[in-house]
Amino acid sequence: DAQSKKPFTYLLVDEFQDCNSVQYEIIKMLYTTGGNVFAVGDDDQAIYGFRGADPGIMQRFRKEYVNADQVVLGRNYRCVPEIVDVSAKVIACNRQRVSKQLTSGREAGGSVLLKGFPGGAEERSYILEQCQGKTPLELERFAVLFRTNSSMGVFEAQLMQAGIPFVTREKITSVYGHFVTRDVMDYFRAAYGCRERQLFLRIWNRPRLRVGRESLDSPVVDFGRIRRFYSEAPYENPAAVRDVEQFERKLEQLGRFSLELGITFIRRGFGYEDYLRRKAGSNRELLENWLEILDWLEEDCRGHENFEKWERCQEQAARQLSQEGTGGNTQKKGIHILTMHAAKGLEYDRVFLMDVNEGTIPYHKAV
């Protein structure tokens, strides 16, 4: 309306790097000749690209408002020189940014250690070792940062199993309730004699069998009955019969394996890993998270005499996590596990960055 289009004398824009194109157009509509725009931002701290924020607008602003003065605040008062120097080298690889010289306003006194691992299991084990023997008050100054909270579940379970106190600021999906964990446990339950219809409806097509729900018309699954169902008209299907026979044989094999070998057999013998690859599609990070849970299950089952004891231990751990609650529990003392997004503006004496692998950090779709 006429009132909103009336020129503003002054306009202050904060967190300019998080501005999207629509917001920028509104700014230009509000600002007319004779006004003063004061925009504050740091394109190196842009974290809202998922909702349309475009830090490139800061460069557009400089081109469209050629008379604007630019003041670069290049001194960092939060981090020691060692961290600022290493960070600046990494950030400088981004060519689509406002060039700036970064320095530290603090005395030297820190270090950055780059440590490589064969895989995620070894990486997590290293951090657990660094936490052993520390008091909750000492761990309060530690933080482990992940790119997304979907990657935290396995580490959360390992911290709890190791008796290491931890604090979460976000809701973490429990690894014990994850569909991958449920599927693996269901395969074992079926191998050890469970014939509940609902269980088989969950695993029947993971991987896909040429068997339909119509053959599971009883609360208790009977393989002989299913074979007969597909051996006679009108549902005669020799391929389905072969699938059922093969599935039954694999369950018998699974029941004879140790737990650890059994998980490997589920992954490859049943083709569950291939099923996860198809389900994840092009989402590489999602697949890696799922495969990490399978790796963790192989670790977690070790030391348990049989499936019944392992299942009971998992149920107890799941209850403990549920009782402690996840997300927003900031009163207890312990190591902090959180996403990089949630860590913005916070300070810790020792920080572990997880999964610093090409394609994960930064995410391959973000570059």
What are these regions (language model features)?
Residues 1-59, 75, 79, 337, ...:
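Conserved helicase NTPase motor core
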Residues 43-47, 52-56, 76-80, 121, ...:
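Conserved nucleotide-binding/hydrolysis micro-motifs of P-loop NTPases
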Residues 182-186, 336-364:
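A short beta-strand element within the Helicase C-terminal
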Residues 12, 36, 54-57, 76-82, ...:
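Helical mechanochemical/support elements of P-loop NTPase systems and associated helical scaffolds
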Residues 33-36, 42-44, 65-70, 108-112, ...:
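Short glycine-/polar-rich loops that comprise or flank the Walker A/P-loop
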Residues 64, 108-110, 135-259:
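ATPase/helicase motor core of nucleic-acid motors
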Residues 66-69, 74-165, 191-193, 255-256:
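Helicase P-loop NTPase motor core
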Residues 232-342, 363-365:
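Accessory C-terminal helicase-associated subdomains
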